[in-house]
């Protein structure tokens, strides 16, 4: 994890999408990649809560797009789970890895599992044939369909 701690007031601004408030805190010296006790960054929190304007500002401020939390998750993994295609586009345009392993699964796996077709299309556009569910996940889905 990053050594800069993320103050709870900043984390709350990210969750709420208070872009101006966060921009001020960053200008005043808050590290853009500061992490809370669970390893979540401002980018992870804003992404997971669907705050596209805040995500765009954080990316412009050079937030690390693939920095993982304590569970090994990236912002794109969270977005694939939640279904925010607009934020997935922002993250992918900033270099997010659509095949980043998230504890045995990838953003493609999450999008498949939760039926996020629009995100699957984005991921496939970026990675082509490589953007397929992992072998383990494909076997799990096959087993679930047979049960």
Residue ranges and their predicted role:
Residues 1-12, 94, 103, 109-147:
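Ankyrin-repeat-protein effector appendages
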Residues 12-17, 45-51, 78-84, 110-116:
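Ankyrin repeat A-helix N-terminal signature
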Residues 18-26, 51-59, 84-92, 116-124:
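Ankyrin repeat structural motif
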Residues 22-25, 32, 42-46, 55-58, ...:
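Hydrophobic packing within well-folded, soluble alpha/beta domains
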Residues 32, 65, 97-98, 130:
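Ankyrin-repeat inter-repeat connecting loop/turn
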Residues 35, 68, 100-101:
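Ankyrin-repeat boundary/linker signal
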């Amino acid at each position: 994890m990053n050594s800069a701690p993320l103050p709870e007031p900043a984390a709350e601004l990210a969750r709420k999408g208070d872009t101006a408030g966060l921009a001020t805190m960053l200008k005043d010296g808050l590290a853009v990649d500061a992490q809370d006790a669970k390893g979540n960054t401002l980018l992870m929190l804003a992404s997971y809560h669907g705050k596209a304007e805040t995500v765009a500002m954080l990316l412009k401020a050079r937030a690390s797009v693939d920095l993982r939390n304590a569970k090994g998750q990236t912002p794109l993994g969270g977005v694939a789970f939640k279904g925010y295609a607009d934020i997935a586009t922002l993250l992918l345009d900033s270099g997010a890895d659509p095949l980043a392993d998230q504890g045995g699964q990838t953003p493609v796996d999450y999008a498949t599992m939760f039926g996020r077709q629009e995100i699957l299309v984005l991921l496939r556009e970026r990675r082509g044939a490589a953007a397929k569910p992992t072998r383990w996940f494909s076997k799990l889905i096959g087993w679930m369909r047979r049960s």
